[in-house]
A protein has these predicted regions:
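N-terminal, polar/Ser/Thr-rich
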Residues: 28-60, 139-144, 155, 164, ...
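Glycine/proline-rich low-complexity spacer/linker segments in large multi-domain proteins
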Residues: 34, 38-39, 115, 124-171, ...
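Surface-exposed beta-strand/loop patches in extracellular or lumenal glycoproteins
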Residues: 60-83, 162, 168-177, 441, ...
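Hydrophobic helix-coil surface modules that form long, contiguous segments used
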Residues: 61, 149-152, 160-320, 349
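A surface-exposed beta-strand-loop module
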Residues: 81-141, 195-197, 202, 523-535
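Beta-strand-rich binding/interaction modules
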Residues: 85-92, 455-456, 469-542
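Acidic/His/Gly-enriched intrinsically disordered linker/tail segments
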Residues: 206, 313-314, 344-412, 416, ...
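Amphipathic alpha-helical substructures
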Residues: 266-268, 399-489
Length: 557
C-alpha cells in the first residue's frame, strides 16, 4: 500500500516514493488490537448491498458469515461492527439476540456451540457508514462509492472479524444504479438488470483474503481491458477524464504481473482490476481489485521519469508496489500487526526489483539510496524496531521501518545469501503460507532452509532491534615500501546500542592494485591486517552498497 501524509505516514516520492496522501481519521479507528482466533473463525462472507441512487448511503445490506467454532462451550460470537442500524440478526435461520457495544455486535447463540460446529450468522442493516466505504464525487464530478478499509475499517460497513489473521473468502452482490459500473474482489459471476434503473452485480472471491482487502467500487466510469497479453485478465476502471491516459499510466502493470509471476509464483487471483477511486491512500492493494488515488495521473511538473515506460517514476513505483502486494500482503498476510513489514517491506523491495529489471541497475541503486536516507531521517525521530509490538496507533506503523527498512533488510539478505538461495527461500516461504498468514519467524525458517545458514543473529539485530550501523575506519600502515607491505584496518561502529555483526566488504586501492576483503565483526571494534602493494592506500567500505549503513568521518593514524 502507498500512503500520503495526513495519517498514514510519510509522503515518499522520487525513485523510492512509497506514500501518497491521506485524510485524518479518528484515533479510535486506528487503535491497535490483536484479536486472537481462539474460539471461532470466519470461513466465508456473503455480502449483499443495495445502494441508493445518489450513492450516499446503503439502503439495505445483508451479510451472512459462515462460522467455524474452535473451542468448547462457545455461547457468544463477537463481531466487529460500526454504528450502522441493525435491523435483525439470525443464526442458522433462527432469530437471535444481540447486543451493541462500541465497535462490536455481540450475538448470543441459542445453545452453546462446540469445537467443530459450523453455522451461519445473518445480519441485516442499513445506513451510512462513518468510514470504510467512502461516498464521494470522482474526477468527473459523478458520485462514487469505494471500499477503503486499511487497517481495521471494514467493520464500519461489513460485520466481520476485523483482523488480518482472520482471512476468509467473500462474495459480493451489489445493487447499484444502472448507469454505474461495479467491480469487487474476485470473478464477476452475473450482471442482471433489475427494472429500468438498477443493475445487480455478483462477484465471488474463492481464495481467503484479509478483511482489509474486501472491497467494492462503484462509479459512472469506463472499463478498459488491457491490450497486452497477460497471465490473468487485466482491466482498468477509471473516470472518463482518465480514459485516454489510463493505458499509458498503467503500462507497467502487464510487465509487473509477468515479472512477479516468474519471480515468486503464479498470480494468485482470478483477475486484476486497477481502479481510480476514492481512497485515502496512494494505492490500496485490495485482492484482485487495487484502488489508486484519483491524483495518480496528475502532472507534477518536472519530476523523475521511468526510462522504460515514459511515465513518472512515482507512478511506476506505486503500480508495481500494489501489484507486488497481491502475493505479499494479500495471499501471504501478516499474522500480527508487528509483522506488517512482511507486507509493506516486501512490496517496497519487489517494486525496487521491478525497477532494477526495467529501468536498470543505476535506477535501482537510486531507489535504495533514497530508501536509506528515509530510514536515517526516521530513526532520528523514532528509533523503534521493525517488529514493533508497542505502538498503539496503527497508522504510526505506516513508517519507514516497515516500508524502506523492511526493503533494505530483504536486500541485505539477498546479498548475504546470494540470489539463488534468497529467491528459493522466498518461494519456499510463499508456497508454505499462500492463502494464509505468516510471521517473521516463518520467513527466517524458509530462508534458513534454502541457504543452510543460521540467521538468528541477523533477525535479532535487524528486525527485533533498532537502529543501523555507523562505521568509522582507521588505518595504520606497517613496513610499507616500494614493494608494498601491510595495512592494519580498524573498523569501529559508533552508533548507540549493540553492534551489528554483518560481514563488511572493504575495498583497498593501493597504486594500481585493488583488493577486496571482508571484515567479520564480533563486536563494535574489528581489526584486520592486510598485505597491500606499493603506493598510498585508500579504503572504501561496502563499495557495492550491500548494507544499510552510515559512514562516520574516517581518520588515519
Amino acid at each position: 500500500m502507498k500512503s500520503k501524509i495526513r495519517i498514514r505516514a510519510i509522503a515518499f516520492r522520487a525513485a523510492c516514493g512509497l506514500f501518497a496522501a491521506l485524510v485524518f481519521i479518528t484515533p479510535a479507528l486506528a487503535q491497535r488490537r490483536e484479536r486472537l482466533i481462539d474460539t471461532w473463525k470466519p470461513v466465508h462472507y456473503d455480502v449483499a448491498i443495495s445502494l441508493n441512487d445518489q450513492l450516499t448511503e446503503i439502503d439495505m445490506a445483508r451479510t451472512e458469515i459462515s462460522v467455524e467454532v474452535l473451542a468448547p462451550n462457545v455461547s457468544k460470537i463477537g463481531l466487529d461492527f460500526g454504528e450502522m442500524t441493525v435491523d435483525s440478526v439470525s443464526v442458522s435461520g433462527q432469530p437471535a439476540r444481540f447486543e451493541r457495544s462500541p465497535e462490536m455486535l455481540n450475538v448470543t447463540l441459542a445453545r452453546a456451540a462446540q469445537a467443530g460446529d459450523k453455522f451461519s450468522i445473518v445480519v441485516n442493516y442499513h445506513g451510512r457508514p462513518k468510514d470504510g466505504l467512502i461516498f464521494a464525487n470522482d474526477r468527473d464530478s459523478k458520485p462514487s462509492a469505494t471500499g477503503d478499509n486499511w487497517p481495521n475499517r471494514v467493520h464500519q460497513w461489513i460485520p466481520c472479524f476485523d483482523h488480518p489473521s482472520a482471512k476468509a473468502t467473500v462474495s459480493f452482490t451489489v445493487t447499484a444504479p444502472a448507469r454505474d459500473v461495479v467491480v469487487a474482489n474476485g470473478k464477476l459471476l452475473t450482471m442482471t438488470r433489475n427494472g429500468a434503473d438498477l443493475t445487480v452485480w455478483r462477484f465471488e472471491e474463492t481464495k481467503p483474503i484479509p478483511p482489509y482487502c474486501m472491497v467494492i467500487a462503484v462509479n459512472e466510469g469506463a472499463k478498459l481491458d488491457a491490450s497486452e497479453k497477460t497471465v490473468t485478465p487485466l482491466s482498468y476502471y477509471v473516470p472518463q477524464k482518465d480514459r485516454a491516459y489510463a493505458p499509458k499510466g498503467f503500462s507497467p502493470a502487464a510487465s509487473a504481473l509477468a515479472f512477479f509471476n516468474e519471480t515468486i509464483a503464479p498470480y494468485p487471483y482470478e483477475k486484476l482490476a486497477l481502479i481510480i477511486g476514492a481512497t485515502r491512500f496512494g494505492g490500496m492493494e485490495n485482492s484482485s481489485a487495487i484502488v489508486f488515488t484519483s491524483t495518480l495521473f496528475d502532472s507534477r511538473g518536472n519530476e523523475k521519469m521511468s526510462k522504460r515506460f515514459g511515465i513518472p517514476a512515482r507512478t511506476e513505483d506505486v503500480v508495481a508496489h500494489e501489484i507486488a502486494h497481491q502475493w505479499f500482503g494479500d495471499s501471504v498476510t501478516e499474522s500480527t500487526w508487528a509483522d506488517l513489514w512482511l507486507s509493506e517491506g516486501f512490496a517496497t523491495y519487489f517494486a525496487g526489483l521491478f525497477i532494477e529489471k526495467y529501468d536498470g541497475e543505476e535506477a535501482f541503486r537510486d531507489y535504495l539510496r533514497n530508501a536509506a536516507e528515509r530510514c536515517f531521517n526516521y530513526e532520528k525521530q523514532r528509533n523503534t524496531p521493525i517488529h514493533d509490538t508497542e505502538t498503539q496507533d496503527l497508522m504510526r506503523l505506516l513508517n519507514e521501518n516497515n516500508y524502506q527498512k523492511g526493503a533494505w533488510v530483504l536486500h541485505m539478505l539477498r546479498k548475504r545469501l546470494g540470489d539463488e538461495a534468497f529467491f528459493r527461500g522466498l518461494r519456499i516461504y510463499y508456497k508454505a503460507h499462500a492463502e494464509a498468514n505468516a510471521t517473521t519467524e516463518d520467513l527466517r525458517d524458509a530462508l534458513e532452509k534454502a541457504s543452510g545458514q543460521n540467521l538468528h543473529d541477523f533477525f535479532t539485530r535487524w528486525i527485533y532491534g533498532s537502529g543501523h550501523p555507523i562505521y568509522e575506519v582507521s588505518s595504520a600502515s606497517m613496513e610499507l615500501g616500494r614493494a608494498g607491505g601491510f595495512l592494519t584496518i580498524t573498523l569501529k561502529q559508533t552508533q548507540s546500542g549493540d553492534a551489528f555483526l554483518d560481514p563488511v566488504p572493504i575495498e583497498i586501492t593501493s597504486g594500481s592494485e585493488k583488493k577486496r576483503i571482508v571484515i567479520r565483526p564480533e563486536g563494535k571494534i574489528a581489526t584486520e591486517r592486510v598485505r597491500i602493494g606499493g603506493g598510498h592506500p585508500s579504503i572504501e567500505i561496502d563499495p557495492d552498497g550491500t548494507l544499510l549503513k552510515e559512514l562516520a568521518a574516517s581518520r588515519k593514524s
